[in-house]
Amino acid sequence: MNPTVSIAVILTVLQAAHCQMIRDLSACLLGQSLRVDCRYENKTSNPLTYEFSLTRQQKHIIQSTISVSENVYRNRANVTMHKNLVCLYLHSFTTSDEGVYMCELKATNDYTGNQIKNITVIKDKLEKCVRLSLLIQNTSWLLLLLLSLPLLQAVDFVSL
């Protein structure tokens, strides 16, 4: 095999070998609901599968596309997916829902295995969610607004 072709194949495999990585896992209270944000870096367009679970004495699957969710959480939990963010919402959150929450992500055809991150959730120690946090994930609109303020002021469109 040609050495140039070999190097190209190795680089392709190495690039595809690590397709996503969980960057951050955070939790906050949104009214009476728990929100768990699982932020990840995705380097592929392959579909993403996820699993959110809670461990107290044993593991309880809350919401998943990897395995079957437990019945007790089906009516209380939902997941939303945004660019580089998977959010779990657990409604009617109480102290009995405290424990270690896990986010597990896997991109289809990613041979490095699942990416997993844990966070300990205690209701009294949770901060309230900032409602704009999802909008800030995509900051291009915010940057455009900030950059256009001087122009808007120059034409006396906005007076600050």
From Swiss-Prot:
Listed GO CC annotations: dendrite; external side of plasma membrane; growth cone; membrane raft; plasma membrane
InterPro entries, per database record: Ig-like_dom_sf, Ig-like_fold, Ig_V-set, THY1
Glycosylation (residues): 42, 78, 118, 138
Subcellular location: Cell membrane
Propeptide cleavage-removed residue intervals: 130-160
GO MF annotation: an example: integrin binding
Record keywords, A-Z: Cell membrane, Disulfide bond, Glycoprotein, GPI-anchor, Immunoglobulin domain, Lipoprotein, Membrane, Pyrrolidone carboxylic acid, Signal
Chief place where the protein resides: membrane
Lipidation (GPI-anchor amidated cysteine): 129
Modified residues (Pyrrolidone carboxylic acid): 20
UniProt note on tissues of expression: Forebrain, cerebellum and tectum.
GO BP, sorted A to Z: angiogenesis; cell-cell adhesion; cytoskeleton organization; focal adhesion assembly; integrin-mediated signaling pathway; negative regulation of axonogenesis; negative regulation of cell migration; negative regulation of protein kinase activity
Domain of life, per lineage: Eukaryota
Annotated function: May play a role in cell-cell or cell-ligand interactions during synaptogenesis and other events in the brain.
Protein name as annotated: Thy-1 membrane glycoprotein
Lineage, uppermost ranks: Eukaryota, Metazoa, Chordata, Craniata, Vertebrata
